[in-house]
């Protein structure tokens, strides 16, 4: 329609075609489904890495930090060592989001412990003000920023492993699901929508409303399930049916 509108502005002979197109009803838009992990699913996922192996330790810390900060995958991959302030009175992480916006996210004490363990293993001699990539891979002896494909691969791997021990785990796990999971858990815990929007780095609160809609749908499904169970119970017989004397008594006529 935008193209036809433009064509009509350039050539008035095309205006009729544009007006005809405007009469075509738009396809009904369906709400976006928010995929997130339940508490048992999240626990099962985080239990899969074998932290005795360096790569698994790295992957675990990546997933923990991703959940705690609700960061986008690209934001975490862009993090540098200097973006962590673990020894501050209130530990924080700096995330470089869309539009070059930087937001400050508080870190839980357990996350700080995991990050310190990771830094001791992967950045033992790196200064805390270093701009070296926080998460990296080594290719031909050279450290390079970890790629999105690497992240997607280990999420899928641990997702399959978690599925075998926890049926609640979704069939396909992807990195962005961790951001959705943290957002849903915070919303369900009572975080105000405006604050959640700032936490996620959304430019508009309307974008964050998908979590409210998703939570409402969950409640609706639970209510419908309860009604379905109630509907299976037998309806009690009407003891007054065909009993004229009882009907008269109930009506106050006897």
List each language-model region with its residue ranges.
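Conserved catalytic core of the tyrosine transesterase superfamily
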Residues: 1-254
């Amino acid at each position: 329609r935008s193209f036809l509108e433009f064509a009509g502005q350039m050539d008035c002979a095309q205006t009729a075609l544009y007006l005809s197109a405007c009469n075509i009803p738009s396809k009904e838009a369906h709400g976006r489904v928010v995929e997130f992990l339940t508490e048992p699913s999240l626990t099962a996922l985080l239990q899969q890495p074998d932290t005795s192996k360096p790569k698994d330790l790295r992957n675990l810390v990546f997933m923990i930090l991703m959940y705690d900060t609700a960061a986008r995958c690209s934001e975490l991959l862009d993090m540098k060592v200097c973006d962590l302030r673990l020894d501050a009175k209130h530990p924080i992480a700096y995330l470089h989001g869309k539009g070059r916006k930087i937001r400050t996210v508080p870190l839980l004490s357990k996350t700080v412990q995991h990050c310190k363990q990771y830094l001791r293993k992967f950045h033992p001699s790196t200064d805390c003000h270093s701009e070296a990539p926080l998460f990296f891979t080594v290719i031909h002896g050279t450290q390079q920023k970890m790629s999105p494909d690497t992240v997607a691969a280990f999420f899928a791997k641990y997702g399959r492993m978690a599925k075998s021990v926890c049926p609640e785990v979704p069939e396909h796990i992807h990195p962005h699901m961790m951001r959705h999971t943290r957002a849903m858990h915070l919303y369900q815990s009572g975080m105000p929508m405006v604050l959640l929007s700032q936490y996620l780095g959304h430019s508009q609160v309307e974008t964050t409303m998908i979590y409210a809609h998703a939570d409402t749908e969950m409640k609706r499904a639970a209510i419908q399930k309860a009604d379905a169970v109630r509907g299976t119970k037998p309806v009690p017989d009407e003891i007054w049916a065909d009993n004229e004397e009882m009907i008269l008594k109930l009506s106050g006529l006897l």
